[in-house]
């Protein structure tokens, strides 16, 4: 948001308030049996409501209203959280709410990723000299996101319907083509940039796997985990590491420690997808995925925790 508005990032007490509300939401859900599901839902949903308010305020104050559309997707994520709580209480499970939440988060990855990936890639490649550069956000990207959102809406409501399957496969092909336009093959020299392309690769992979559910024996969980662990999980760590290097005054370069973090989270994503595709190996693969996932995020904590708590390097 600060990059869009030219304003300082949220800091101090407002940032502490957001963190406190997020932690309160986690505690409220954990103790929902004691405080009641309505109270738990209200506390849990307060975080995303405050995020919407903070983002909207910054965008309007920065007079960058064209980016207000980001609030649509954050608002959808908030609505998905409400659906999750209501469905869990009245139906005993939250199947639709979970899919809705994944779909809304994936839409954010597609929207924001479609801007930052070609942007960071172009900055990196321009320093390397002549060669193909990524195509920046244009009408095709808007068409791709709109088509993907339509397919995701169908997936939330009827994930095994054959027409939905065709829409999902078509969205997967669109996103493969979208990714190919960003010159990712030229980023192998810098893992900090390459990981963004690898993270986005899980977006079309998840669409195709989810689309094949209606036509093959591929389980629904394969595509779900391609999105949740792959696209969302890997992209989260990719952005966290890049932002943390910048916030702590370090060079924007992925050293061996950061590369190990990337390797671990990619292994977690691959193992979790294959655990769904090869159930005879699921016991081993699930443990590999869990261990690699924990290792990746603990590795991030070890690599950046101390630096983020200290004053920024000059």
Range-by-range predicted roles:
Residues 1-314:
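Hydrophobic alpha-helical transmembrane segments of multi-pass integral membrane proteins
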């Amino acid at each position: 948001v600060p990059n869009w508005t030219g304003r300082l990032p949220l800091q101090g007490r407002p940032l502490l308030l957001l963190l406190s509300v997020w932690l309160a939401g986690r505690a409220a859900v954990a103790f929902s049996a004691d405080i009641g599901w309505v109270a738990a839902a209200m506390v849990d949903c307060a975080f995303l409501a405050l995020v919407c308010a903070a983002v909207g305020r910054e965008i309007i104050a920065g007079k960058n209203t064209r980016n207000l559309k980001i609030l649509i997707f954050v608002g959808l994520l908030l609505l998905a959280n409400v659906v999750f709580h209501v469905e869990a209480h009245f139906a005993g499970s939250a199947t639709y709410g979970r899919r809705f939440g994944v779909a809304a988060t994936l839409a954010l990855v597609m929207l924001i990723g479609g801007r930052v990936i070609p942007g960071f890639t172009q900055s990196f490649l321009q320093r390397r000299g002549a060669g193909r550069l990524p195509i920046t956000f244009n009408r095709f990207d808007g068409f791709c996101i709109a088509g993907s959102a339509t397919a995701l809406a169908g997936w939330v409501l009827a994930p095994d319907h054959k027409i939905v399957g065709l829409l999902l496969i078509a969205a997967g092909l669109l996103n493969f083509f979208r990714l190919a336009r960003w010159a990712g093959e030229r980023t192998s020299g810098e893992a900090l940039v390459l990981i963004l392309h690898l993270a986005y690769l899980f977006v079309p992979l998840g669409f195709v796997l989810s689309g094949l559910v209606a036509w093959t024996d591929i389980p629904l969980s394969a595509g779900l985990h391609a999105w949740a662990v792959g696209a969302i999980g890997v992209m989260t760590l990719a952005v966290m590491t890049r932002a943390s290097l910048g916030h702590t005054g370090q060079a924007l370069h992925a050293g061996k420690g950061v590369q190990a973090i990337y390797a671990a989270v990619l292994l977690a994503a691959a193992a979790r997808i294959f655990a769904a595709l090869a159930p005879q190996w699921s016991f081993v693969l699930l443990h590999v995925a869990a261990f690699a996932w924990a290792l990746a995020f603990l590795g991030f904590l070890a690599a950046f925790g101390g630096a983020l708590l200290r004053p920024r390097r000059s």
